[in-house]
Amino acid sequence: MKQPSYSITETDLALLTDLYQLTMLQAYWAEGMQERATFSLYFRRLPATRRFMLACGQQYAAELVTRLGFSDAQLTRLADTGQFRDDFLAWLGQWHFTGDIWTLPEGTPVFENEPFMEVDAPIAEAQLLESLVMNLVQLETVIASKAVRVVLAAGERPVMDFGLRRMHGIDAAVRGVRAYRTAGLAGTSNVLGGLRHGMPLSGTMAHSYILAHDDEEAAFTAFARHYPDTTLLVDTHDTLEGVRKVINLMHAEPGLRVGAVRLDSGDLGQLARGARTLLDAAGHSEVKIVASSGLDEWKIEALV
């Protein structure tokens, strides 16, 4: 049995809607209802911990809508459902968006009951777009709104995205990088997302790399030789002992340059202060400290 494809392309998106949007569209068409209507996208209520949301995805959605259309294959599949008239499907095959879309610029803070995207079109067309537009905008707005809180909590310190493995599917992982860029993150570990959306790539090393070597010193040395000014992960066994090993490595091989050490577990605040003390005392105040491990705005605020 042939497995269905998991990939979704732009040409598939005309069918990315709820069934009732299409059945209402057919009813509007059959009744000759062509009056213009305005559909507004806004937050009626914000969560108790949020003062604003960061609008994102609406300009992408607006551009996409202008390219939407139904292919012959899609019309055939709709006909197979038995819910649509042949003359309606013939009309749908010629359909393209004829309305207007208004949006605030992406990256604009928005508040309760403040529209940040409006579709003004014949009511049938505006109705058809509702589910797709809300899906496109909701994802990126939610991600950007969380990300900007993290950026604000970090202040002058750059924030990187290492969240690919926890994102809810491939589409969210790639489009999430676009939202992170809008929110002001400095880089991402997501290669596809970063290259597609023009965001600098950033990465360090994994605990598995450390464990693949005989000891931490061997892992640090090999990685630093290949990648000057790299970031070394120091918490696989003992965080502060890992920092001492990095210091010893830089002293033993003066040509090796280490840009930062990364802390990924434990009491990050206490360990960061300890690492800073060790590095400064050894004459390596230029080596930065990177903290990771599920950090959100609350944890970052406590750290800085």
Where are the model-predicted features located?
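N-terminal, Lys/Arg-enriched amphipathic/low-complexity engagement segments
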Residues: 33, 37-93
